[in-house]
């Protein structure tokens, strides 16, 4: 089974994942957590996009060949929705390609055990939590950008 948690930073994905893992362990289910993030260290957005395409090809192939057929629980902390949302906003390229990859690679698997949770909350509360967390991981603490991010995750 595959469960994907995706949304903006500081919305509670990690908290929900921890709760799911605890429940799975109570039931004797083996869990694997895969955490994906943007590619760091490259200045050229075209190079980032090229590497991202390869990364998502690999993610979807692994999902199809290993995660979906397994009896284990594979939890993705971020996946392709983040690429779709953040690419045009912060990396200046269209992230819609992830849906074409998803459709091509997972075409026979999309009706299987794949569940997606995308969390939405009040943007002011998210920014407040993000500031309290203070890890500097969010792309932006700007209210208008946060609203745009949330709209794209819907």
Give the ranges of each region predicted by the language model.
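Conserved P-loop NTPase "ATPase switch" module shared by AAA+ and STAND
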Residues: 71-84
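Conserved substrate/cofactor phosphate-moiety recognition/catalytic segment
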Residues: 11, 15-72
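Hydrophobic anchor at the beta1->P-loop junction of P-loop NTPases
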Residues: 5
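A glycine- and Lys/Arg-enriched "phosphate-lid" helix/loop adjacent to the NTP-binding pocket
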Residues: 86, 90-153
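Loop/turn-to-beta-strand initiation segments
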Residues: 70-74, 112-115
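Anionic group-transfer/hydrolysis microenvironments
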Residues: 8, 78-80, 120
């Amino acid at each position: 089974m595959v469960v994907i948690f995706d949304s903006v930073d500081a919305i509670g994905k990690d908290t929900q994942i921890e709760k799911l893992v605890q429940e799975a362990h109570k039931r004797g289910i083996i869990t694997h957590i895969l955490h994906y993030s943007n590619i760091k260290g490259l200045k050229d957005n075209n190079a980032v996009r090229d590497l991202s395409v390869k990364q998502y090809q690999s993610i979807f192939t692994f999902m199809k060949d290993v995660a979906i057929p397994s009896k284990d629980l594979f939890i993705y902390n971020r996946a392709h929705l983040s690429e779709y949302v953040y690419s045009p906003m912060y990396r200046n390229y269209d992230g819609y390609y992830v849906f074409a990859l998803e459709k091509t690679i997972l075409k026979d698997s999309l009706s299987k055990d794949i569940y997606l949770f995308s969390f939405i909350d009040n943007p002011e509360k998210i920014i407040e939590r993000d500031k309290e967390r203070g890890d500097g991981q969010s792309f932006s603490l700007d209210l208008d950008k946060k609203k745009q991010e949330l709209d794209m995750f819907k």
